[in-house]
């Protein structure tokens, strides 16, 4: 499994419209081969910042499959206008360490 991480800085005053657009965009990415899971979380300290976490089966499912698709073109149309600055996207391997509470 690969974890994609992106910090999304949304233009001030546009978070409500961004979240509405993201509700549509998430359906595009979730239909892609290799997609596993997505979380969009809003920052508590900076209400214009979000973290996007996407789990993929393989790196290529994101970098070639999704980014090379018509769905990605629509994703761009829906979301890219909200970002300032444009986000850096990074990919992470399986956990080196992991811990959680039982149950």
Locate each region found by the language model.
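Short, functionally important structural connectors and interaction interfaces within domains
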Residues: 2, 24-27
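An amphipathic, aromatic/His-enriched active-site/gating alpha helix that lines ligand/cofactor pockets
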Residues: 27-36, 55-90
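Conserved GNAT-fold acetyl-CoA-binding loop/helix
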Residues: 19, 23, 69-70
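Glycine-rich beta-strand-turn "strand-cap" elements at beta-sheet edges
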Residues: 2, 39-46, 76-103
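Short, surface-exposed ligand-recognition loops at beta-strand->loop->(often short) alpha-helix junctions
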Residues: 9-20
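Short, well-ordered beta-strand segments in beta-rich or mixed alpha/beta enzyme
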Residues: 2-9, 39-67, 92
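Residue-level signal for secondary-structure boundary sites
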Residues: 16, 60-62, 97-99
